[in-house]
Amino acid sequence: MPEGKDYGIVITEGMSEYPMADSDEGLQYAEVMMKIPRQWLENGNLLEDDEHSWVIEILCKTAYLGHIFDGAYVDEKVIIPYGEPDEAYPFDWDYEFTAVMLCRSEDIPALQTDEETKIKFYTLVPITEAERKLVEEKGSEEVKRMLSSGDMVDFEREILTEN
Protein backbone atom coordinates (compact mmCIF):
# COMPACT_ATOMS: atom_id res chain seq x y z
CA MET A 1 0.00 0.00 0.00
CA PRO A 2 1.37 3.43 -0.89
CA GLU A 3 2.57 5.33 2.18
CA GLY A 4 0.28 8.17 3.24
CA LYS A 5 -2.46 7.25 0.77
CA ASP A 6 -6.00 6.17 1.62
CA TYR A 7 -5.96 3.47 -1.03
CA GLY A 8 -4.16 0.25 -1.84
CA ILE A 9 -3.10 -0.88 -5.30
CA VAL A 10 -3.92 -4.31 -6.73
CA ILE A 11 -1.96 -4.95 -9.94
CA THR A 12 -1.64 -7.76 -12.46
CA GLU A 13 1.61 -9.61 -12.89
CA GLY A 14 2.33 -11.50 -16.10
CA MET A 15 -0.01 -9.74 -18.51
CA SER A 16 3.05 -8.17 -20.14
CA GLU A 17 4.89 -11.49 -20.37
CA TYR A 18 3.61 -11.93 -23.93
CA PRO A 19 2.73 -9.26 -26.49
CA MET A 20 -0.83 -8.45 -27.41
CA ALA A 21 -1.82 -7.48 -30.96
CA ASP A 22 0.90 -6.12 -33.18
CA SER A 23 0.61 -2.39 -33.29
CA ASP A 24 2.87 0.43 -34.30
CA GLU A 25 1.40 2.47 -31.42
CA GLY A 26 3.43 0.58 -28.82
CA LEU A 27 0.43 -1.15 -27.26
CA GLN A 28 1.80 -4.69 -27.18
CA TYR A 29 2.74 -4.80 -23.48
CA ALA A 30 0.65 -3.68 -20.52
CA GLU A 31 -0.31 -4.35 -16.92
CA VAL A 32 -3.52 -3.18 -15.26
CA MET A 33 -4.33 -2.19 -11.70
CA MET A 34 -7.03 -0.83 -9.44
CA LYS A 35 -6.78 1.65 -6.60
CA ILE A 36 -9.12 0.33 -3.94
CA PRO A 37 -10.06 1.60 -0.48
CA ARG A 38 -7.34 0.69 2.02
CA GLN A 39 -9.79 -1.12 4.31
CA TRP A 40 -10.63 -3.65 1.57
CA LEU A 41 -7.05 -4.93 1.78
CA GLU A 42 -6.89 -4.84 5.57
CA ASN A 43 -9.75 -7.33 5.79
CA GLY A 44 -7.70 -10.16 4.27
CA ASN A 45 -7.68 -11.92 0.92
CA LEU A 46 -9.81 -10.26 -1.79
CA LEU A 47 -10.46 -13.67 -3.37
CA GLU A 48 -12.17 -14.84 -0.19
CA ASP A 49 -14.14 -11.61 0.25
CA ASP A 50 -17.51 -12.09 -1.50
CA GLU A 51 -18.22 -8.35 -1.44
CA HIS A 52 -14.98 -7.33 -3.20
CA SER A 53 -13.84 -10.39 -5.17
CA TRP A 54 -15.03 -8.66 -8.35
CA VAL A 55 -11.78 -6.64 -8.21
CA ILE A 56 -9.73 -9.76 -8.93
CA GLU A 57 -12.27 -10.99 -11.51
CA ILE A 58 -12.19 -7.79 -13.58
CA LEU A 59 -8.38 -7.52 -13.36
CA CYS A 60 -8.03 -11.11 -14.64
CA LYS A 61 -10.63 -10.58 -17.37
CA THR A 62 -8.79 -7.48 -18.56
CA ALA A 63 -5.40 -9.19 -18.44
CA TYR A 64 -6.62 -12.04 -20.66
CA LEU A 65 -8.59 -9.83 -23.04
CA GLY A 66 -5.59 -8.69 -25.04
CA HIS A 67 -4.33 -12.25 -25.44
CA ILE A 68 -7.40 -14.37 -26.20
CA PHE A 69 -8.83 -12.33 -29.07
CA ASP A 70 -6.77 -12.07 -32.23
CA GLY A 71 -5.81 -8.45 -32.86
CA ALA A 72 -7.02 -7.25 -29.45
CA TYR A 73 -5.15 -5.02 -27.04
CA VAL A 74 -5.98 -2.85 -24.04
CA ASP A 75 -5.50 0.90 -23.82
CA GLU A 76 -7.43 3.93 -22.65
CA LYS A 77 -9.98 3.55 -25.45
CA VAL A 78 -11.24 0.26 -24.00
CA ILE A 79 -14.32 -0.12 -21.78
CA ILE A 80 -14.81 -3.53 -20.19
CA PRO A 81 -18.25 -4.60 -18.95
CA TYR A 82 -18.62 -6.69 -15.83
CA GLY A 83 -20.38 -9.94 -16.69
CA GLU A 84 -21.16 -10.75 -20.28
CA PRO A 85 -20.72 -8.02 -22.92
CA ASP A 86 -24.38 -8.13 -23.92
CA GLU A 87 -25.62 -8.37 -20.37
CA ALA A 88 -23.41 -6.36 -18.02
CA TYR A 89 -24.49 -6.33 -14.40
CA PRO A 90 -23.33 -4.36 -11.34
CA PHE A 91 -20.17 -5.28 -9.41
CA ASP A 92 -22.24 -4.83 -6.28
CA TRP A 93 -26.05 -4.81 -6.39
CA ASP A 94 -26.15 -1.77 -4.08
CA TYR A 95 -24.51 0.41 -6.76
CA GLU A 96 -24.87 1.20 -10.47
CA PHE A 97 -21.31 0.46 -11.63
CA THR A 98 -21.34 -2.06 -14.50
CA ALA A 99 -18.05 -1.54 -16.36
CA VAL A 100 -14.51 -0.23 -16.05
CA MET A 101 -12.72 2.32 -18.18
CA LEU A 102 -8.96 2.17 -18.62
CA CYS A 103 -6.88 5.25 -17.78
CA ARG A 104 -3.15 5.82 -18.02
CA SER A 105 -1.63 5.20 -14.62
CA GLU A 106 -0.75 8.29 -12.60
CA ASP A 107 1.29 6.18 -10.20
CA ILE A 108 3.49 4.05 -12.43
CA PRO A 109 5.16 5.42 -15.57
CA ALA A 110 5.75 3.22 -18.62
CA LEU A 111 8.64 0.83 -18.10
CA GLN A 112 11.22 0.24 -20.84
CA THR A 113 12.56 -3.26 -20.12
CA ASP A 114 14.70 -3.57 -23.24
CA GLU A 115 15.07 -1.96 -26.66
CA GLU A 116 11.83 -3.45 -27.97
CA THR A 117 9.66 -3.80 -24.87
CA LYS A 118 7.84 -0.91 -23.24
CA ILE A 119 5.23 -1.87 -20.63
CA LYS A 120 2.36 0.58 -20.14
CA PHE A 121 0.36 0.64 -16.92
CA TYR A 122 -3.36 1.35 -16.84
CA THR A 123 -5.75 1.94 -13.96
CA LEU A 124 -9.24 0.41 -14.14
CA VAL A 125 -11.96 2.79 -12.93
CA PRO A 126 -15.55 1.60 -12.33
CA ILE A 127 -18.20 3.48 -14.30
CA THR A 128 -21.98 3.41 -14.72
CA GLU A 129 -23.87 2.99 -17.98
CA ALA A 130 -24.44 6.78 -18.19
CA GLU A 131 -20.73 7.40 -17.58
CA ARG A 132 -19.89 4.85 -20.27
CA LYS A 133 -21.58 7.12 -22.81
CA LEU A 134 -19.48 10.04 -21.54
CA VAL A 135 -16.28 8.00 -21.89
CA GLU A 136 -17.22 7.11 -25.47
CA GLU A 137 -17.78 10.82 -26.24
CA LYS A 138 -15.00 12.50 -24.26
CA GLY A 139 -12.43 9.76 -23.57
CA SER A 140 -11.36 8.14 -20.31
CA GLU A 141 -8.77 10.77 -19.36
CA GLU A 142 -11.33 13.59 -19.57
CA VAL A 143 -13.92 11.61 -17.60
CA LYS A 144 -11.31 10.71 -14.97
CA ARG A 145 -10.63 14.44 -14.45
CA MET A 146 -14.37 14.98 -13.98
CA LEU A 147 -14.67 12.30 -11.26
CA SER A 148 -14.43 13.53 -7.67
CA SER A 149 -12.34 10.46 -6.76
CA GLY A 150 -10.13 10.54 -9.88
CA ASP A 151 -8.95 7.02 -10.68
CA MET A 152 -9.66 5.48 -7.26
CA VAL A 153 -12.55 3.04 -6.73
CA ASP A 154 -15.21 4.98 -4.81
CA PHE A 155 -18.75 3.65 -4.87
CA GLU A 156 -19.94 6.65 -2.82
CA ARG A 157 -18.85 9.24 -5.39
CA GLU A 158 -21.26 11.37 -7.35
CA ILE A 159 -22.38 9.75 -10.62
CA LEU A 160 -21.66 11.82 -13.72
CA THR A 161 -24.48 12.48 -16.13
CA GLU A 162 -24.49 13.84 -19.66
CA ASN A 163 -26.00 17.17 -18.55
Please describe what each predicted stretch is.
Residues 1-20, 27, 33-163:
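Acidic, proline/glycine-rich low-complexity IDRs
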